[in-house]
UniProtKB/Swiss-Prot annotation:
Catalyzes the condensation of carbamoyl phosphate and aspartate to form carbamoyl aspartate and inorganic phosphate, the committed step in the de novo pyrimidine nucleotide biosynthesis pathway. It comes from Helicobacter pylori (strain J99 / ATCC 700824). Pathway: Pyrimidine metabolism; UMP biosynthesis via de novo pathway; (S)-dihydroorotate from bicarbonate: step 2/3. PROSITE patterns: CARBAMOYLTRANSFERASE. GO terms for molecular function: amino acid binding; aspartate carbamoyltransferase activity. InterPro entries: Asp/Orn_carbamoyltranf_P-bd (IPR006132), Asp/Orn_carbamoylTrfase (IPR006130), Asp/Orn_carbamoylTrfase_sf (IPR036901), Asp_carbamoyltransf (IPR002082), Asp_carbamoyltransf_Asp/Orn-bd (IPR006131). GO terms for biological process: 'de novo' pyrimidine nucleobase biosynthetic process; 'de novo' UMP biosynthetic process; amino acid metabolic process. Keywords: Pyrimidine biosynthesis, Transferase. GO terms for cellular component: cytosol. The gene is pyrB. This is Aspartate carbamoyltransferase catalytic subunit.
Length: 307
């Protein structure tokens, strides 16, 4: 039997104390990416991390790569389009072969929600879920929390804040992970989407973006995940944007909290998810999320590999 090993497959794998530890460490790195201690660099310099991404990625894979390098570790990034999976090798066999090379950690992304949990059964090194189907994306939720933590100043200040998720909530692993994490921290949540993009949930829901904007201290826009839809829901993305785009006019007219902040996990469909002018607004935290992604993933890698 494989030895017990600490993985990060979903946010519930972490206690609240561990989340606080990660926030504190990541905040240090967000202030200065070079604030890695000599001791950490020395311990990380012989670590080899493998990234197995079976779905496309820009921010997540680059963020993990940069985080690894900033800590002093080495990272091997496989191109799955040219790997033996294209020759019919199964996911499990691919993983077992990479695992046999004894990396110090493996980061994986897959279209199946169950994939990381199945792989964890075979893993004797830390396994990090970088996105699985529609179910989980724990490091994205953690970096989003870091963004809120740094904006509002503390977890205590976050309690009671209202966040509205706008867009394809049903198919969003980002929303799923964020909702589970933020509920633990006492935030009030609303979901805003057309019926076909809403999950069955006890949470507050609305089909009206104006209602969501009026409700929220925090707006998180979500991409329409057309690759996960069985049939078109709107005639075009433009039609969807007419109903659900976060625009300056909607913010000016309906936001009760004029300091409402806007987040998006990316990739952003400009003028469909969020109006270009809003993306350039000081209330947009989208690029801060990207920066915080490197910092949080540095903290996660250090936590799993060294602590």
């Amino acid at each position: 039997m494989p030895k017990k090993c600490r993985h990060l497959l979903q946010t519930s794998d972490l206690s609240l104390d561990e989340i606080k530890l990660l926030l504190n460490k990541a905040s240090v790195y967000a202030n200065d990416f070079n604030a890695v201690s000599l001791e950490t660099r020395e311990k990380m310099q012989d670590k080899i991390i493998v990234a197995l991404f079976f779905e496309n990625s820009t921010r997540t894979v680059s963020s993990f790569e940069i985080a690894s390098l900033r800590l002093g570790a080495k990272i091997v990034k496989l191109n799955m389009q040219t790997s033996s999976t294209s020759k019919g090798e199964t996911l499990i066999d691919t993983f077992k072969n990479i695992h046999a090379m004894q990396p110090d950690a493996i980061i994986t992304r897959h279209a199946f929600s169950s994939a990381p949990f199945k792989l964890a059964e075979f893993s004797q090194c830390p396994l990090i879920n970088a996105g699985s189907g529609t179910s989980a994306h724990p490091t994205q939720a953690l970096l989003d929390l870091l963004t809120l933590y740094r904006h509002f100043g503390s977890l205590e200040n976050l309690k009671g804040k209202k966040i509205a998720f706008i867009g394809d909530v049903k198919n969003s692993r980002v929303a799923n992970s964020n909702i589970k994490l933020l509920q633990r921290l006492g935030l009030e949540i609303m979901l805003c989407a057309p019926s076909s993009m809403l999950p069955i949930t006890p949470l507050k829901t609305t089909h009206n973006i104006e209602e969501a904007i009026g409700f929220a201290d925090i707006l998180m826009s979500l991409r329409t995940q057309t690759e996960r839809h069985n049939a078109p829901i709107f005639a075009s993305l433009k039609d969807y944007g007419n109903a659900y785009c976060i625009t300056q006019k909607r913010l000016e007219t309906h936001a009760k909290n004029k300091e409402v902040i806007i987040l998006h996990p990316g990739p952003v469909h400009r003028d469909i998810d969020i109006e270009s002018a809003v993306l350039e607004d000081k209330r947009s935290k989208v690029l801060e999320q990207v920066k915080n992604g490197v910092a949080m993933r540095m903290a996660v890698l250090e936590f799993l590999l060294l602590d």
